[in-house]
């Protein structure tokens, strides 16, 4: 772009300056709208959504800084013949343009790689913290792009004829051979990686997965034919990754794993990523690579190369929003985008993870699964956590609940919430308990014992009375009978004493060797009482509880061991719901 006269090449550049400026403003608004639309439609930002937002942000910077700078300088030169590029503006333009060009190439390649990873290895993708890896990839992309693109500004250029000496000759052949070769190789690597990942994704989606599904159905059908008595094996669906939400004892979301996408959503996202990759390769990657190759070969930079590079860069910033808008998953209306803008401007600090911190109303946040690990039919969206009133945190319902990555001492435990403070009505107690759960009941007069001195004086007599009552057949009772007689008083009157001590229940919960209190083994024959203290065999209210510092007078009157099989539906009685509450909060 040598200065002097209004030659044909100068006239062509200046005639396009106003168009570049208008298209840059339109691209800036369109990409900003796309970022707000994705944020409004997807409350939980996944790796693909994050990469799409970063790609749109890169296009905003491309339209706002280098392209707008080039257009403004050309308009200024058209208005004043004395104005021209200076060294500082040219260096800023070259550094920002090549930084954003490389960042766009690598972000598109990373987008296609994450989609291939999610389709080809779905379980590994969900267990590998892909969101953090996407953030690290973006930081690495920007670091590499910025370092390489700023090297020409600090001396890595052709010293014979510097690219900013006459105008601003930003084609790679005018900057330097070393920079041109490195830039072309990095650009070629990003293009090839994106195309390979898209090809693997399409193969996995269109051929490999349906073929494996057909093979699984044929294998299941043959097994079902051989073992027809088992039933249902021939029609077993293909494996799907369950949606898992990990919560602490207060229901606070700690981490989550997304489940398998529906066929419609998977196809939409795959088509969108593939379209973005082909858009970039056809409009930006390959044209810039061809221009760089021919410019290095001929050691020249004619005006058509400048026009081709700038218009290709502008075209991709305009077409990306239209591609994302065509995907129904990320299409938001004006009202939704406006609400998202208001939420961002108001800087609302409320929790947006679908959980609640205040559990004084007795609600429990949880995600339920069936026995095969699939999500229940009640809620397919893992971000929408259901608040179920009237549920107690000590005992899960019939359907299996997956509490993952929560320490045993924190699982259904007492650390962060006081679940023993609120008294409940007699009708809110458990209506039915498993017949395999045996509860020993001592006489009513034994519950009125005093402190440890009285208990030590009558311990042997109480043990003899226990054995006599058990021999007579009156030592076993249901949990409901135990609670009504021991906590509520006989005849449903006012309570005469506490049901269990807090230390008793928490010790039972924390010291159980199984994944949860609900998964204890089946009943076993009664064994002689061991002489030594074993915390894993400590029953609620046993005399041995003195080793953990429990009051002995009241704990001696209640001895309880809760057992039951996890696989038995009778272990939890009839189904629980808001109209059929379960074990309430116990009082002290």
Curated annotation (Swiss-Prot):
In the bilayer, the protein is annotated as: Multi-pass membrane protein
Sequence ranges on the Cytoplasmic membrane side: 39-49, 113-133, 196-275, 325-588
The portions of this protein that span the membrane are 18-38, 50-70, 92-112, 134-154, 175-195, 276-296, 304-324
Compositional bias annotation for Low complexity: 530-540
Region feature Disordered, mapped onto this chain = 511-545, 561-588
> Which stretches does UniProt call biased (Pro residues)?
514-525
* Molecular function in Gene Ontology: G protein-coupled receptor activity
Q: Which residues carry this modification: Phosphoserine?
A: 413, 435
Stretches assigned to the Extracellular side: 1-17, 71-91, 155-174, 297-303
InterPro entries, alphabetically?
A: GCR_153/162 (IPR022347), GPCR_Rhodpsn (IPR000276), GPCR_Rhodpsn_7TM (IPR017452), GPR162 (IPR022348)
Cellular localization per UniProt: Cell membrane
- UniProt keyword list: Cell membrane, G-protein coupled receptor, Glycoprotein, Membrane, Phosphoprotein, Receptor, Transducer, Transmembrane, Transmembrane helix
Record's keyword annotation contains Iron = no
Q: Which is a Pfam family this sequence falls into?
A: 7tm_1
Q: Which domain of life is it from?
A: Eukaryota
Q: Name one GO cellular component term.
A: plasma membrane
Q: Sites of glycosylation?
A: 86
Task of the protein = Orphan receptor.
| Family note | Belongs to the G-protein coupled receptor 1 family.
Q: What is this protein called?
A: Probable G-protein coupled receptor 162
Q: Which organism is it from?
A: Mus musculus
């Amino acid at each position: 772009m040598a200065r002097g006269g209004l030659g044909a090449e100068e006239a062509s550049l200046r005639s396009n300056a106003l168009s570049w400026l208008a298209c840059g403003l339109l691209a800036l608004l369109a990409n900003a709208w796309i970022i707000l639309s994705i944020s409004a439609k997807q409350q939980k930002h996944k790796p693909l959504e994050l990469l799409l937002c970063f790609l749109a942000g890169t296009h905003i910077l491309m339209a706002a800084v280098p392209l707008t700078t080039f257009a403004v300088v050309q308009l200024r030169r058209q208005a004043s013949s004395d104005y021209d590029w200076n060294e500082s503006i040219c260096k800023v333009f070259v550094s920002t343009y090549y930084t954003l060009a490389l960042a766009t190439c690598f972000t598109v390649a990373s987008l296609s790689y994450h989609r291939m990873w999610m389709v080809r290895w779905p379980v590994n993708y969900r267990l590998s913290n892909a969101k953090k890896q996407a953030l690290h990839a973006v930081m690495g992309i920007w670091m590499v792009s910025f370092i390489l693109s700023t090297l020409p500004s600090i001396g890595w250029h052709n010293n014979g004829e510097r690219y900013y000496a006459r105008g601003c000759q930003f084609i790679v052949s005018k900057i330097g051979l070393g920079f041109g070769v490195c830039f072309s190789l990095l650009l070629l690597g990003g293009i090839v990686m994106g195309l390979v990942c898209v090809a693997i994704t399409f193969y996995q989606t269109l051929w490999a997965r349906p073929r494996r599904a057909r093979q699984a159905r044929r294998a299941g059908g043959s097994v079902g034919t051989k073992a027809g008595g088992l039933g249902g094996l021939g029609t077993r669906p293909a494996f799907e990754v369950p949606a898992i939400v990990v919560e602490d004892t207060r229901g606070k979301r700690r981490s989550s794993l997304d489940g398998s996408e529906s066929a419609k959503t998977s196809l939409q996202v795959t088509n969108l990523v593939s379209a973005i990759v082909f858009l970039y390769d056809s409009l930006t990657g390959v044209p810039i690579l061809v221009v760089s190759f021919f410019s290095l070969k001929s050691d020249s930079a004619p005006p058509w190369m400048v026009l081709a590079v700038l218009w290709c860069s502008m075209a991709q910033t305009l077409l990306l929003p239209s591609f994302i808008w065509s995907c129904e998953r990320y299409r938001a209306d004006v009202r939704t985008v406006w609400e998202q803008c208001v939420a961002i401007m108001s800087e609302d600090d409320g929790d947006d993870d679908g959980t609640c911190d205040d559990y004084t109303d007795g609600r429990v946040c949880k995600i339920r699964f069936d026995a095969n690990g699939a999500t229940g039919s009640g809620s397919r969206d893992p971000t929408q956590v259901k608040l179920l009133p009237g549920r107690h945190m000590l005992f899960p319902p019939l359907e299996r609940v997956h509490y993952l990555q929560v320490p045993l001492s924190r699982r259904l435990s007492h650390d962060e919430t006081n679940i023993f403070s609120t008294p409940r009505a007699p009708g809110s107690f458990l209506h039915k308990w498993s017949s395999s759960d045996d509860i020993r009941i001592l006489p009513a007069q034994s519950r009125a014992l005093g402190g440890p001195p009285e208990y030590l004086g009558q311990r042997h007599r109480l043990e003899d009375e226990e054995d006599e009552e058990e021999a007579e057949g009156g030592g076993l009772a249901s949990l409901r009978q135990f609670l009504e007689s021991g906590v509520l008083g006989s005849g449903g009157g006012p309570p005469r004493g506490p049901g269990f001590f807090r230390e008793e229940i928490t010790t039972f919960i924390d010291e159980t060797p199984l994944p949860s209190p609900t998964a204890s083994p089946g009943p076993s024959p009664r064994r002689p009482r061991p002489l030594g203290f074993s915390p894993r065999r400590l029953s609620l209210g046993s005399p041995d509880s003195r080793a953990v510092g429990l009051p002995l007078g009241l704990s001696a009157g209640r001895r309880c061991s809760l057992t039951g099989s996890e696989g038995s539906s009778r272990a939890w009685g009839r189904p629980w719901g808001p109209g059929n509450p379960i074990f309430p909060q116990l009082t002290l």
